[in-house]
């Protein structure tokens, strides 16, 4: 299970991969919560992120899972009899399969140093806070692995790791744990003990400027441009090179009242690249609108594209999307009626 945060070496890695994936990618959003300090001296888990991270994000899972609007969005569409009928049923099934109740987790902060490639093992971790039972969580991990985790003491903390010690989990207090590759797990422990500098600078400043949002993320793109992004798409005359000039990007997903919104801001090194990217995003919307769409989606795609707003101010490109819960329900009903 631990391998899924880093290297997939054992069968048990699949379950932690599912857990981490759910914690950082669920797109249901709701108002964020103001969290009280947790025991063990951890007042805010963002303060445990190491300075070397150039990507950091936050998800408030408890509000996502308890929001009635989003539960209704899942519950409304007709389903097969064998499928989970409600969102709570989905969570129950996941708990039955994995031994992990996602409702025990309140909030997660994920972080990465994107300059460390997968060939070098990568650098990614998630710090999670909630009301969970550590022994039950370890039992679930070991059950999925079919064996025991290795345990090593590090600066007064037990680090539980997979067989090749590439990925690990450590409990920082009764209500906080960190999972990820073993290097960032150790770095978080060092930050907590005052032996390593916590996140600061432009990443932390931008993170704070994003305010209270259910899901938010900031990334410095210094290592994400030309090294990982192709210049074009195979078979299509589309130039992707302007995106290599992104210096910083942010993402916010939130819900206020019954309205959901998403906003992505791309900060380019120059206005020319931002303008080219703006034209490319607009072109992509036109291409999607022209593509053949299955009958059940013919009413959905145009409505969603109409919700997309693209604005540019010099070297800053902003892409936003806003929709109400009732509009989502109408789209679902129109899709079912097609």
Name each model feature, range by range:
Residues 68-103, 148-258, 274, 290, ...:
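An internal, short helix-loop-strand segment that often contains or flanks glycine-aspartate motifs
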Residues 289-338:
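A cross-kingdom marker for long, charged
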Residues 57, 100-201, 264, 319-333:
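Single conserved position on a long alpha-helix in the C-terminal lobe of the eukaryotic protein kinase
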Residues 39-41:
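Bacterial signal peptide processing site
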């Amino acid at each position: 299970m631990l391998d899924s945060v880093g290297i997939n070496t054992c069968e048990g890695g699949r379950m932690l991969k599912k857990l981490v994936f759910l914690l950082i990618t669920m797109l249901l959003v709701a108002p964020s919560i103001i969290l009280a300090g947790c025991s063990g001296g951890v007042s805010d888990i963002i303060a445990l992120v190491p300075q070397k991270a150039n990507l950091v994000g936050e998800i408030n899972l408890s509000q996502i899972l308890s929001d009635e609007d989003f539960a209704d969005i899942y519950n409304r569409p007709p389903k097969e009899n064998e499928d989970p009928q409600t969102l709570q049923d989905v969570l129950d099934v996941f708990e039955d399969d994995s031994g992990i109740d996602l409702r025990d987790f309140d909030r997660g902060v994920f972080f990465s140093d994107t300059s460390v490639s997968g060939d070098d093992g990568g650098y990614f971790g998630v710090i999670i806070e909630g009301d969970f039972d550590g022994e039950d969580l370890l039992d679930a991990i070991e059950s999925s692995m079919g064996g025991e985790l290795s345990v090593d003491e590090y600066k007064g903390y037990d680090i539980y790791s997979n067989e090749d010690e590439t990925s690990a989990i450590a409990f920082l207090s009764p209500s906080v744990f960190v999972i990820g590759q073993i290097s960032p797990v150790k770095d978080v422990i060092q930050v907590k003990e005052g032996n390593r500098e916590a996140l600061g600078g432009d990443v932390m400043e931008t993170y704070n400027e994003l305010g209270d949002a259910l899901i938010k993320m900031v990334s410095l793109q210094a290592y994400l441009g030309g090294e990982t992004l192709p210049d074009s798409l195979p078979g299509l005359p589309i130039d992707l090179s302007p995106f290599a000039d992104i210096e910083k990007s942010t993402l916010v997903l939130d819900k206020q009242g019954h309205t959901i919104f998403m906003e992505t801001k791309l900060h380019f090194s120059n206005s020319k690249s931002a303008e080219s990217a703006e034209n490319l995003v607009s072109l992509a919307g036109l291409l999607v609108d022209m593509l053949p769409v299955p009958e059940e989606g013919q009413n959905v795609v145009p409505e969603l594209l109409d919700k997309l707003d693209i604005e540019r101010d010099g070297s800053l490109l902003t892409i936003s999307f806003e929709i109400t819960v009732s509009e989502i329900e109408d789209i679902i009903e129109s899709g079912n009626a097609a």
